[in-house]
Design a protein with these regions (language model features):
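Short, low-complexity, polar/charged sequence segments that are solvent-exposed and flexible
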Residues: 92-96, 115-116, 126-130, 161-164, ...
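Coiled-coil termination/hinge junctions
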Residues: 12-72
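Domain-scale macromolecular recognition modules
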Residues: 46-124
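Hydrophobic alpha-helix feature that most strongly marks membrane-spanning transmembrane helices
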Residues: 16, 23, 112, 126-136
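Intrinsically disordered, low-complexity regulatory tails
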Residues: 131-181
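Short, small-residue-biased leader/transition segments that mark boundaries at the very start
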Residues: 2-6
């Protein structure tokens, strides 16, 4: 019984991971985006490397937006970028956003120690909604939390995190008015 529960959890995590890969493919814009996803699949053992040795992938940066109030907002395009954004970019008092209970990009709102207006929170949440599996819906529920509250379990696949929050909002998936750099 216990082994079955453990196996069920592993299968659920595997499905969630593969859904995150599908989402990353769907929001890919360039060949470099797809190359990053392929490299991740090689590193996680889903596909075999066709050329011997470690293949160097061109550095591919997260998407960068600026809110109406002048705050920088970054959006990961794949699981590796999501990990980079969440654990190596910004500081603990920046805000982290993610579509609730569905695959999607990690979104980081850099505060630089300033008070963040509601409109900027809404724009960051809209980016998390749009760059998620829910992008075809008009509205998506988005969780947000201080970056320092987001943790990566030991041995977790790229892009997988845990967080506990009482903060969520329903966000519009329309991002046409948010300036991308």
């Amino acid at each position: 019984q216990r082994q079955m529960c453990i196996r069920d959890r592993e299968i659920t995590e595997e499905i969630s991971y593969l859904e995150s890969i599908i989402n990353a493919i769907e929001i890919s814009v360039t060949e470099a985006d797809l190359a990053n996803i392929k490299e991740e699949l090689i590193e996680t053992g889903y596909i075999k490397r066709t050329v011997k040795g470690k293949h160097k992938i061109t550095a591919n940066k997260p998407m960068h937006f600026v809110s109406s109030d002048g705050f920088d907002i970054y959006v990961g395009k794949n699981n590796i970028q999501n990990d980079e954004l969440t654990f190596k970019t910004g500081n603990g008092n920046d805000w982290w956003f993610h579509a609730k209970q569905m695959p999607g990009s990690h979104v980081l709102l850099k505060t630089d120690g300033k008070e963040v207006p509601d409109r900027t929170f809404e724009e960051a949440a809209s980016l998390a909604a749009y760059y998620s599996k829910g992008r075809e819906q008009e509205k998506v529920e988005v969780d947000y939390v201080l970056k320092k509250e987001v943790k990566k379990p030991a041995g977790a696949k790229p892009g997988f995190v845990v967080y506990y929050t009482n903060y969520s909002m329903v966000a519009d998936t329309d991002i046409k008015d948010i300036k991308q750099l």
